[in-house]
Amino acid sequence: MNRKDEHIKYALKYESAGNSFDDMELIQCSIPEYNLDEIDLSVNFAENTFEYPFFINAMTGGSKKGKEINRKLAKVAKECNILFVTGSYSAALKNPDDDSFEVVRKENKGLLLGTNIGADKNYTAGMKAVEDLKPLFLQIHVNLMQELIMPEGSRNFNEWEKNILNFVKNIKVPLILKEIGFGMSPETVKKGMELGIKTFDISGRGGTSFAYIENMRGENRFSYLNEWGQSTVSCLLGLKDCIDKTEIIASGGVRHPLDIIKALVLGAKAVGLSGTMLRLAENNSTEEIIEIVNSWKEECRMIMCALNAKNVKELQNVKYVLYGKTREFSLNI
């Protein structure tokens, strides 16, 4: 089976041991100041304005199955006017005949599109991705633990910092440094800022686990690392001091509009969904997913109204209570 198809197969099977969003309770408002139709969902990040605060995050490509998922979700994104980010463009660079990425642009004129490349790649690979897909921005993903567990993974990482610096110097579209489900520490964000990165997708634990995926692909020797990393809520709590200095995108374990709003309350500029969208693509028609996503927009407005927040910025004024391991983490940072 194609490696990308194996990723899809095991991503669909995985269920996290816990979700940090369940450790967070928002304090509601009974007498709001705004009507529902006054609630503004728009957000700004990576030098772009988006009408809605959530998007379809990087997932797949590089196989027939990946192509069909990209095709379906790109159509959903276009019809719903939300952002769609492809998986790593490396697959297309390795195989010139691969059209699993091109199809999203070709079939969806005006699509809000981002794409993705690994930090192990030379900046010229990023330039090619930008040239081919003409995205609004380029994600640079860092996937250290995946590489370490992956049977055929890289063991050489000392060029990543230099590669990121060269991306910053040479790529003409905005850049986002992205984790892949293990979370991003304040030290990593500060290092990225020093290298010139302005936007970070912290992609915490709680959703897709590439440790689990690579364990299932291999001999499962490292199953004790399946829950490696920091949860999404823990990452956001740990990055409170960075919220006003850089742009933080939240992803990892986001299941529905309440999780989206919780991430925005903690200071995220926007929220990405991967595993949730993958499951929707696997189990629903394009029309059904469009209906679900359009409903999410209204549900986000409803929750914001119940929190007396007219816009995403005002969500940061919402009080909340933490429980369990997430509360313990918050007391020790």
Residue ranges and their predicted role:
Residues 45-91:
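Active-site cofactor/substrate anionic-group-binding motifs, chiefly glycine-
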Residues 65-68, 90-108, 120-125, 146-169, ...:
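Active-site-adjacent beta->alpha loops and helix N-cap segments on the catalytic face
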Residues 54-57, 82-87, 111-117, 136, ...:
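Hydrophobic faces of well-ordered beta-strands that scaffold small-molecule active sites
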Residues 44-48, 72-79, 101-109, 127-135, ...:
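Acidic (Asp/Glu)-rich catalytic clusters
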Residues 56, 77, 138, 200, ...:
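Conserved, mostly hydrophobic/aromatic
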Residues 1-13, 277-333:
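C-terminal extensions of enzymes
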Residues 1-46, 50, 325-326, 331-333:
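An N-cap/entry alpha-helix motif that binds or orients negatively charged groups
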Residues 159-161, 165-283:
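Glycine-rich phosphate/ribose-binding loops and adjacent secondary-structure elements
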